[in-house]
Amino acid sequence: MSRYQSINPYTNEEFASYDNSTAAQIDDAINLAHALYKKWRHENPETRSRQLHKIADALREHEDDLAKMMTLEMGKLLRESREEVELCASICDYYAKNGVKMLAPTPIESDLGNAYYLKQSTGVIMACEPWNFPLYQVIRVFAPNFIVGNPILLKHAHNVPGSAALTAKIIRRAGAPEGSLINLYPTYDQLSDIIADPRVQGVALTGSERGGSAVAEAAGKNLKKSTMELGGNDAFIVLDDADPQVLRNVLGDARTYNDGQVCTSSKRIIVEKSHYEEVLHTLKNVFSNLQAGDPLEAGTTLPPMNSERAKEKLEAQVKKAVYAGAEIFYQYPEIDSKGAFFRPVILTNIDKENPIYDEELFGPVAEVFVVDDDDDAIQLANDSSYGLGSSVISNDIKRAQNVAAQIETGMTVINGRWITSGELPFGGVKKSGYGRELSDLGMMAFVNEHLVIDVTKNNQ
């Protein structure tokens, strides 16, 4: 792809485009980031902590601009874009408040001497981020590494270049040193060259399984540490003792937030028999009451998908599923718009031979399965190549915790849908990737655990 393009998915019209970065621009960016890394090595993280609080304030100050840009580029509801900005500001505040303590040396009990390990920066990190949360995906990597002292080079998705540029601009104007976050528009070949550069010490990617595999291969080839946050086919398990009100509340936006374009959103709704009809009709009520329209307008509850290409891919997946025997319980009426609107749909009767059984459907599609008991629910949940997130709905918390512990996944929410916050680790297993972002675990993703041990007494 030769250019990064801003195309409004509500109108399908391009309103901005950005040329690829030149080789000279990329080299200058790496030089600048590497020089900052060297400088930061001699500074205390307390300074960066104060700067990160200012960045949080700046994000809130520019909420309107950021939210509008995200909505224009990838189509999410404006109110959800505003929520994303506040979430990102809170993540910055979280690391500004707690990051310095997290980086304190950790003592080690040893008979060999006085031992501890330092938590030190490692260098420039290449961040490859997706379009579905244009600000959050960036801040999730930037904020902890800013405290650690690892500058970030950003390659954002091809359809949100304006969001990437605006984010970098606001962070710089908030007082972050030049080189803290540098936005680039590289080609895929240039990205491989960046990863291979000895001044770059790690790669963080959130994206598709295909993209993650290619970038992880490049990182491994060059012995660079990487974290991969990839797709999900998450299970939403409804046990037979689920509270009906809790169930209705949670299903209210479990498959519609961000138009279903959330990697941790529950794609597979696994229901024990007694709640099956209730779940189907609750989802139908949610879907049928959506109002398609301009995502900038307050009354809209069903926005377009992020692109015409994404809509067509999802339509093809649903068509393939139905051809293989899946049944449509409900589908939203036709939408008279030139925008990238997908009609929300509820699918049932999906067997293991169906080609979508182990695919991620990234949009407002609910796949509903019926099972006999907890064991069947767990078995079905784990019969997946993915393991990112899950939900368990039950009135018995201990029972829900027991089920949660048996799911092969990175995250489980009891009596709720997916959730994220600065203090909560984010990541998955299987083909959903490896490593963690956010919390103290994410803070240590690209840290050098540097052992120091004093054995003077043994050699006197």
Where are these regions (language model features)?
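Structural signal for hydrophobic packing residues in well-ordered secondary-structure cores
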Residues: 37, 41, 56-63, 67, ...
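Short, well-ordered beta-strand elements within core beta-sheets of diverse protein domains
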Residues: 16-21, 35-42, 127, 236-239, ...
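Short loop/turn microsegments at loop-to-beta-strand junctions
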Residues: 1-4, 266, 388
